[in-house]
Structure formats: C-alpha cells, structure tokens
Design a protein with these regions (language model features):
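N-terminal presequence-like segments and the immediate start of the first folded domain
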Residues: 1-21, 113, 189-193, 207-209, ...
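Glycine-rich phosphate/diphosphate-binding loop of Rossmann-like nucleotide-binding domains
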Residues: 12-61, 65
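Solvent-exposed alpha-helices and their adjacent loops that cap or buttress functional pockets
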Residues: 13-17, 122-128, 161-165
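Charged, often glycine-rich, active-site loop that binds/positions anionic groups
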Residues: 67-80
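Intrinsically disordered, low-complexity domain-flanking/linker segments in eukaryotic proteins
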Residues: 77-129
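Conserved acidic residues
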Residues: 131-133
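C-terminal binding/interaction regions
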Residues: 136, 145-222
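Short glycine-rich, flexible loops that bind phosphorylated cofactors or substrates
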Residues: 141-143
C-alpha cells in the first residue's frame, strides 16, 4: 500500500469504459513482474466496463521496443477503422442499384456476404482507433549504464508518440533499483504490503480515453 500522501487520487467521477477500445503492449523481460502488472491492468479495465473483445494485447521482447510498438499499434487501429468505414461506404452507396434490365441488384447484400467471409475467424470487437494504449515494462538497474540509457529513451519515446499521434499513452514502465521494488509495485511481494500499479494504469487509460473522446468533440468531461 502507499505510505503517507504518495499515490494516485481516485478519479472523480468514476468513468464508464464500455465504449472504449484499449491497447496494451508489454515487454517480456522480468516476466514475473510483467504478468502481475498485466493482470492488475486487466482487472481495472474490466471493473470500469471495458469489454474484453475491445482490449488488444501485444508483446515485444524488451522495454526499448515499447515506443515503436505503441506507435505501430495505433496506426494499425487507424487502418482497421478506415477499412471498416470504407466497406460500409461502398455497401451503402450501391444498395438497390438498378441494372440495365430494370431489375434490382442487391450489391449491398453481396458485399456484406463477402465481408463476412473475409472476417470469419477474426477477433470480434471494435475496429475504432484506440482510445488509449498502455505500455508496460520493467527495468531493473544493473552494473552498467544500460538501465539509464533505456529508461531515458523509452520515457521520451512514449511521450513523443503520445504527442505525435494524439492517442493517450499510459506510462507503465517501472524503473527499479532492485527486484524487490518490482515485486512490491506488482503487488506480489512476500510481505504483502505492495500495490499493483497495473490497476492504476487501467484506470488512467479509461479516464484518458473518455476525456479524449470528449475533447475531440469540443466537450470537457469531468
């Protein structure tokens, strides 16, 4: 648990994430810590109403790859959205088109059938661009400068992606001096006094996702 005044304030009011699409990308280094953080993140997202089918999880080898992966995930979600919108537009414009013999050709139905076959076996869920993406990693200081270089590069990289794309990026990178600090921040320390920061990241993603939608419409959401 947090001591003193340190820790996140509870979001006010509680935000409803049922309409959101959230991305998660996590490194695979320090898997015990990462797995617990991922569980905490998902727990928080589900508690806020985010549907499992609207959560996309990707993995990368290490934390250094997180900024690139976040950017590419967001671009991929934009591509999905454009493809879906384009298919709907074609179907709508061709509905009820009359042929030269005066009969009515239902091209919309044909297009819909082809689209269903194309999507067969694909994951169900929203194809909207991500409302927020959570980047999860855990760096533990060693005997070289590797820790400092990676921490700095990833921190600046994630901020740059957030500002360049306009997609909210939740900073889920733990920069740890010891393994014990990581266990505590993943809520799996032996003493049981830790707090799973993944729960905070999930709540932050929902809040930012809801506010981002409001801001894009000129509305200030509390």
């Amino acid at each position: 648990m947090f001591e003193g005044i340190k820790g996140p304030g509870a979001p006010q009011p509680h935000h409803n994430g049922s309409a959101l699409r959230i991305g998660i990308v996590h490194a695979r280094w320090n898997d015990q810590i990462i797995s617990a953080l991922l569980d905490g993140t998902l727990k928080s997202l589900h508690a806020a109403g985010v549907k499992q089918e609207n959560i996309v999880i990707q993995t990368v080898p290490g934390s250094y790859e997180l900024p690139y992966a976040v950017r590419q995930m967001y671009l991929a979600s934009q591509t999905q959205h454009a493809a879906t919108a384009g298919g709907s537009l074609v179907a709508g414009s061709s509905s009820g088109t009359a042929d030269l013999l005066g009969s009515s050709t239902n091209l919309a139905g044909l297009a819909a059938g082809q689209q269903e076959k194309k999507e067969e076996g694909e994951t169900k869920g929203s194809k909207e661009p991500f409302d927020a993406i959570i980047a999860i990693g855990a760096l533990i200081k060693g005997s070289t400068m590797h820790f400092e270089y990676i921490s700095d590069a990833v921190s600046h990289g994630l901020m740059r992606v957030q500002l360049d794309t306009g997609c909210a990026v939740v900073f889920g990178l733990l920069t740890l001096l010891t393994e014990e600090q990581g266990l505590e921040r993943a809520g799996i320390d032996a003493a049981g006094k830790g707090h799973n920061h993944g729960e905070d990241w999930g709540a932050a993603a929902v809040e930012l996702g809801v506010k981002r939608r409001g801001w894009s419409e000129g509305v200030f959401v509390q």
